Amino acid sequence: MNPNQKIITIGSVSLGLVVLNILLHIVSITITVLVLPGNGNNGSCNETVIREYNETVRIEKVTQWHNTNVIEYIERPESDHFMNNTEPLCDVKGFAPFSKDNGIRIGSRGHVFVIREPFVSCSPTECRTFFLTQGSLLNDKHSNGTVKDRSPYRTLMSVEIGQSPNVYQARFEAVAWSATACHDGKKWMTIGVTGPDAKAVAVVHYGGIPTDVIQSWAGDISRTQESSCTCIQGECYWVMTDGPANRQAQYRAFKAKQGKIIGQTEISFNGGHIEECSCYPNEGKVECVCRDNWTGTNRPVLVISSDLSYRVGYLCAGLPSDTPRGEDSQFTGSCTSPMGNQGYGVKGFGFRQGNDVWMGRTISRTSRSGFEVLKVRNGWIQNSKDQIKRQVVVDNLNWSGYSGSFTLPVELTKRSCLVPCFWVEMIRGKPEETTIWTSSSSIVMCGVDHEIADWSWHDGAILPFDIDKM
């Protein structure tokens, strides 16, 4: 057989195979369309199948029609009732790790936001990590100078708890350089403070839509909690400060329902200073442990009732929990007055357990490094130094930062009490390290019925980054 004959033979065989393949497809389609629908045994071919995923990314409505899937993304159904949140706090023996985002480690090569002030808040179906971005990414030129607290680029965003604050999973919440957020059982409410120092505005969002505003009333950097607000039976409470950071300022508690402000009260606290309150629900009231940035190394305590009446004072315990602070042995404690005569401070938290108190603090007395939680017997009502439990979360060789409180609602845990939880921010970069940026990651711990061993769940990123070497 000569070469031309070989080519003709191969071509003929190939053409025959193509024709046979086409015929087989025609037969397959004919059987699918005409025969299978009539046999009564293929009920799933021409119907809609709903797949619900227990996550915030999406719910898929999948329509299957003749072997073709049509996917439509639909919104998560809203709950039809408010959370109660009038239960007492659970009594806990220690705190177990809930999540760790490792955002800075991942951000050395991933698209992760430069952030500060992360916090956690929970709905009946999920917990989310909220954070204030700087409008820039780690290891990028726009991260330069992000040690600054307030800028027009800062926004409140959130991810499902445990995720890094990355570009692909983050959800926009509000334009803000100070913020709070909480869920009433039906929708998320967020408050973002932004604007110039003298005329800042707090914008209330409910279900993602702006619903109300609060204008600065003292004209001096109006600001809020940097942690979860508190919703009880559909009404949500939070605390704001307006005025100097190092002397007497003005303080207000607010109440909103479905994103509309329905009440506010001025908190009279002459000689005391309140900032960055960490609040939680307990037996139908809102209990807050705050920051005194003026003179006290003990923390202000604010208890708010549903009618916005309140009690204000200081955490009674005979151990200081702010930073910087003096020696424990030199501290006496007070339920009514600032003690310690140390300016500045750091956001922190405490939980009432009957008359006892769990309180968090940095291990270092002078810098934001290390972190521990202490349980002090009768520390909520007396100047007690009786430390009955201690747990290390970050060792003193590693940086910490802000810390704050939240609770797991009974809808999540199926318990009859609210589980107390806290988060610890771990600040990296400026001013303590040689970088052009400042950012943070966080570790989240929740109360359990067991004692938990000391360990260090520190940030762990190796600095400087490439951008810092240019």
From Swiss-Prot:
Its main location: virion. Substrate binds at R116, R150, E275, E276, R291, R368. Keywords: Calcium, Disulfide bond, Glycoprotein, Glycosidase, Host cell membrane, Host membrane, Hydrolase, Membrane, Metal-binding, Signal-anchor, Transmembrane, Transmembrane helix, Virion. Residues 1-14 are intravirion. The keyword Transmembrane applies. Residues 89-470 are annotated as: Head of neuraminidase. Inhibited by the neuraminidase inhibitors zanamivir (Relenza) and oseltamivir (Tamiflu). These drugs interfere with the release of progeny virus from infected cells and are effective against all influenza strains. Resistance to neuraminidase inhibitors is quite rare. Residues 36-470 are virion surface. Its EC number is 3.2.1.18. GO terms for molecular function: exo-alpha-sialidase activity; metal ion binding. It is a single-pass type II membrane protein. Glycans are attached at N42, N46, N54, N84, N144, N293, N398. It holds the Pfam family Neur. One of its GO terms (cellular component) is membrane. Catalyzes the removal of terminal sialic acid residues from viral and cellular glycoconjugates. Cleaves off the terminal sialic acids on the glycosylated HA during virus budding to facilitate virus release. Additionally helps virus spread through the circulation by further removing sialic acids from the cell surface. These cleavages prevent self-aggregation and ensure the efficient spread of the progeny virus from cell to cell. Otherwise, infection would be limited to one round of replication. Homotetramer. The influenza A genome consist of 8 RNA segments. Genetic variation of hemagglutinin and/or neuraminidase genes results in the emergence of new influenza strains. The mechanism of variation can be the result of point mutations or the result of genetic reassortment between segments of two different strains. Belongs to the glycosyl hydrolase 34 family. Intact N-terminus is essential for virion morphogenesis. Possesses two apical sorting signals, one in the ectodomain, which is likely to be a glycan, and the other in the transmembrane domain. The transmembrane domain also plays a role in lipid raft association. This is Neuraminidase. It comes from Influenza A virus (strain A/Duck/Memphis/928/1974 H3N8). The gene is NA.
